[in-house]
């Protein structure tokens, strides 16, 4: 997948920040990012995050075909996003490829920000 590291961080308290992502460290449950407005790199704990949105940078036709199950993710704040993912409940997060990829190519969902997950029938 092509990307330039530009992401949108969505926090559990409701605010969002545009940033450049350096790395998602699932083992330590943190990510390293540089907020667009600050310019300084910071470590963001998963406990503060809801999800990380990766804006679409290429035409939809050029996006990689997602693999996994069709699921509906409901966050603690009531937002529901449907998409394709390979979900492992043991992992601290997972990538969700939204059904509507016109804005976001993929979303990193933080497991502890989820209220429920439903596997949808085809």
Task: Identify what each model region corresponds to.
Residues 1-122:
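Conserved RNA-binding domains used in RNP assembly and mRNA/RNA metabolism
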């Amino acid at each position: 997948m092509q990307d330039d590291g530009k992401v949108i961080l969505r926090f559990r308290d409701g605010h969002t920040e545009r940033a450049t992502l350096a790395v998602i460290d699932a083992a330590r449950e943190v990510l390293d990012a540089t907020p667009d407005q600050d310019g300084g790199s910071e470590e963001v704990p998963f406990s503060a995050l809801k999800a990380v949105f990766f804006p679409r940078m290429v035409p939809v036709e050029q996006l990689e075909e997602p693999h996994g199950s069709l699921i509906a993710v409901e966050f603690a704040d009531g937002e529901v996003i449907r998409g394709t993912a390979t979900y492992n409940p043991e992992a601290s997060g997972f990538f969700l490829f939204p059904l509507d990829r016109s804005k976001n190519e993929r979303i990193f969902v933080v497991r502890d920000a989820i209220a429920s997950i439903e596997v949808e029938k085809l």
